[in-house]
């Protein structure tokens, strides 16, 4: 596979942003060998997996800490990993000169990737996955823009009720960050960061959704289980899976990214 790390000045982030990408390259051995001119000039469009990193991480973590490049190579797909800082994939309108991470993905990065690279823009061939804070981003994008994705996977996270800040430290942290981004809790409730409300509103339009966690993860009882109960009580279709003994860790996420690719029909070629 080809690995690209590129920086470009974003209109929505008001700064340069680093994006890591994995792209199919010329098969060099076996029956998949092809002529370079034929391969690169074929005009073929490949499925895209959008991968959102967690808090205190960056766009390089999935490259450095998992075998995602190998798994993408086996399936001949494009993987896109943007850098979101600690934004919770929200629009921070009062930060610096504005840091509109939520809009950046759908309004800037997706058009860039779909038009500059051999990436399919067909929603049925675009999938999104993220761990921890990235899971909040996944839920937010799929709930508010179900028309853009063929599936979404939330790893090691649950989506809290914005009125539930007294549940515990982890829940309060998510709600606090989303409130800060919007300039207040009521403002957060009125926009795309009210993820549960968006899920209820668009529950008949949602693509296939998946959510998993390790039972030793501190998010398990405080965030994951209440979120699972919420989906069941509101008729929101989502597949849930728990892994005994795993914590908040890359060993689990490396296993899960393979399972998710298969779940979304991105099979080994």
Pin down the residues of each PLM region.
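Non-catalytic cap/lid and distal C-terminal segments of serine-dependent acyl enzymes
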Residues: 1-269
């Amino acid at each position: 596979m080809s690995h690209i790390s590129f920086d470009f000045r974003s209109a929505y982030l008001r700064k340069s942003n680093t994006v890591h990408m994995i792209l199919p390259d010329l098969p060099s051995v076996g029956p998949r060998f092809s002529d370079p001119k034929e391969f690169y000039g074929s005009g073929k469009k490949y499925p895209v997996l959008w991968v959102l990193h967690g808090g205190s991480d960056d766009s390089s973590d999935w490259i450095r800490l998992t075998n995602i490049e190998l798994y993408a190579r086996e399936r001949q797909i494009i993987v896109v990993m943007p850098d979101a800082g600690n934004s919770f994939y929200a629009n921070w309108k009062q930060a610096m000169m504005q840091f509109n991470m939520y809009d950046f993905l759908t309004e800037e990065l997706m058009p860039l990737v779909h038009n500059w690279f051999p990436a399919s823009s067909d929603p049925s061939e675009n999938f999104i996955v993220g761990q921890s804070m990235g899971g909040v981003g996944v839920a937010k994008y799929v709930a508010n823009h179900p028309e853009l994705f063929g599936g979404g996977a939330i790893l090691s996270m649950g989506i809290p009720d914005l009125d539930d800040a007294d549940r515990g430290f982890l829940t309060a942290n998510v709600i606090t960050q989303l409130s800060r981004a919007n300039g207040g809790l009521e403002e957060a409730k009125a926009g795309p960061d009210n993820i549960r409300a968006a899920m209820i509103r668009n529950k008949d339009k949602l693509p296939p959704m998946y959510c998993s966690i390790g039972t030793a993860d501190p998010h398990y009882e405080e965030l994951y289980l209440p979120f699972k109960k919420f989906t069941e009580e509101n008729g929101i279709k989502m597949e849930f899976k728990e892994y005994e003994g795993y914590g908040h860790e890359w060993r689990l996420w490396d296993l899960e990214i393979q399972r998710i690719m298969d779940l979304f029909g991105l099979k080994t070629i």
